[in-house]
Amino acid sequence: MKDILILGIETSCDETSASVVKNGRQVLSNVISSQVALHQKYGGVVPEIASRKHVELIMPVIHQSLEEAGIKIEQVDAIGVTYGPGLVGALLVGLSAAKALAFALDKPLIGVHHIEGHIAANYIEHSLLEPPFVCLVASGGHSHIVYVQDYDKFEIMGKTRDDAAGEAFDKVARAVGLGYPGGPIIDKTAKLGNSKAIDFPRVHFGDQSLDFSFSGLKTAVLNYINSMEQKGEKYSVEDVCASFQAAVVDVLTDNLISAARIKGVKKVALAGGVAANSLLRSELVEKAKGLGLEVFYPKPVLCTDNAAMIACAAYYEFLRGHTSDVYLNAIPGLKLGER
């Protein structure tokens, strides 16, 4: 059987990335140019700046990915690209490059949903992983529990009703003066604190709902900080981070395990930037032990936005004959399962 090479392109937020993946699982290259340092002074991603940087970097990043893979552009079988959700200006840069290449080379174009890409990162890390399983996709923009019935069949079982988990990490990090991005900094700082020092709320909705809500938790953290400052008392940043992180992780892991029970599956997975959190990984493994659940998660570099996951997802779309035409447009609010 002939090897299938997919060129993946990802520009949905502040990473410019291109990757070549063979047969959906073997990464030949995965070039990622991050803009984190560029946006740090603003405390978050500035869409216009992100788009302009993508324009500057997209072709050099694509060329580098082909060079590292040791192939010529003509050798790729198809081009996969994120077309939503994300920042519309950022999405358009990657999409324009992918469409131009596909048209010029007469190669199939495959539009990939960003969240499907994050889920697919697990296939790269775990060569034997196959659906069905339930997956928690948690990042700065998303908090979803997804039932992965097949490589191209997804059901959202739960989602955030307000702030995404990663967004809450960013806001709390800013509140305690740790800067942006909040996830890695809080993870590191929390290791020095006591997770039981402050009893922050855990929101669980009734009626078997697996939805999340982190705005109340975020407000509780801000109220605690303001209260301590008004009383002229010092508070431990380490304890705040540890207690906040523990509250988030408790809810995420509880809901994911509940989803596995509801669907009767024995495999649970993590995906997205928050999936790199060390407590989330260890806590899920610990809770899954006595339940006969297998736990899967990608290496940290595959948790953040990257094109390898997009190429992987595109591969399974390609096998099913799902391709896009040159009229494919960026859809910033694209819902999972829409085509």
Curated annotation (Swiss-Prot):
Pfam families: TsaD
Presence of the UniProt keyword Protein biosynthesis in the record: no
Protein localization: Cytoplasm
An individual GO BP term: tRNA threonylcarbamoyladenosine modification
Positions that bind Fe cation: 114, 118, 305
Keyword annotations of the record: Acyltransferase, Cytoplasm, Iron, Metal-binding, Transferase, tRNA processing
Enzyme class: transferase
Keyword Amino-acid biosynthesis: no
Reactions listed under catalytic activity: L-threonylcarbamoyladenylate + adenosine(37) in tRNA = N(6)-L-threonylcarbamoyladenosine(37) in tRNA + AMP + H(+)
EC number: 2.3.1.234
Binding site for substrate: 137-141, 170, 183, 187, 277
Cofactor: Fe(2+)
One of the record's GO cellular component terms: cytoplasm
Annotated cofactor note: Binds 1 Fe(2+) ion per subunit.
Known role: Required for the formation of a threonylcarbamoyl group on adenosine at position 37 (t(6)A37) in tRNAs that read codons beginning with adenine. Is involved in the transfer of the threonylcarbamoyl moiety of threonylcarbamoyl-AMP (TC-AMP) to the N6 group of A37, together with TsaE and TsaB. TsaD likely plays a direct catalytic role in this reaction.
NCBIfam families: gcp_kae1, T6A_TsaD_YgjD
Family: Belongs to the KAE1 / TsaD family.
Protein name: tRNA N6-adenosine threonylcarbamoyltransferase
